[in-house]
Amino acid sequence: MKWALTTGRARIMCPPALDWQWVAEPRGWPAWNPKIEEIVPFAADPPREGWRFRIAYRLRKNKTQLADAEFVEFRQNERLVCRTSGGDLNPGGWILETYALYADEDTTVLTHTVDLSNSKMPYFARFAVVFLTNLFNSSGDLGHVRNLKALIEDGVPPPAISG
């Protein structure tokens, strides 16, 4: 079974370089992803491949989870892949989140996918996540990518890239 699922997709009225400024700076993620409370980098240098940080997120019952994250792929204006471990994942488990951007005329198509293959979640839990996501968000129109689209198209300036 395929354990990667699309959780967000949007056509954003901006060039990929502007969209990338939002996606590539994790300290700005809480502005458009309500599940994220705080990002704490392990180093002051700007984000790049290998950049590591701690992420505090709230998933259910107002309980905060802390996880470690690292950028495993960082292709400017094209693709960002983040590996996250810890939190309420089983020990040794991790997920990959991918933000893929591509230019389409005068817009950017942004797609967010989550790969649960290495999460060490029980089979039925993974199945439930994939099933429910496909049932209620098969188009990818819901979620935090939609929030990012609204911020960009409303003219909110992106967070400053650190470093």
Question: Locations of the language-model features?
Answer:
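Beta-strand/loop substructures that line and gate deep hydrophobic ligand-binding cavities in soluble
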Residues: 84-142, 159-161
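Alpha-helix N-cap/helix-start motif
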Residues: 22, 32, 64, 90-94, ...
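Glycine-rich portal/gate segments that line the openings of hydrophobic small-molecule binding cavities
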Residues: 40-90, 109, 142-163
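Short, surface-exposed coil-to-beta transition loops
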Residues: 5-7, 64-69, 92-97
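Generic structural detector for well-ordered beta-strands
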Residues: 9-13, 40, 70, 100, ...
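Hydrophobic ligand-binding cavity/cleft-lining segments
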Residues: 1-48, 163
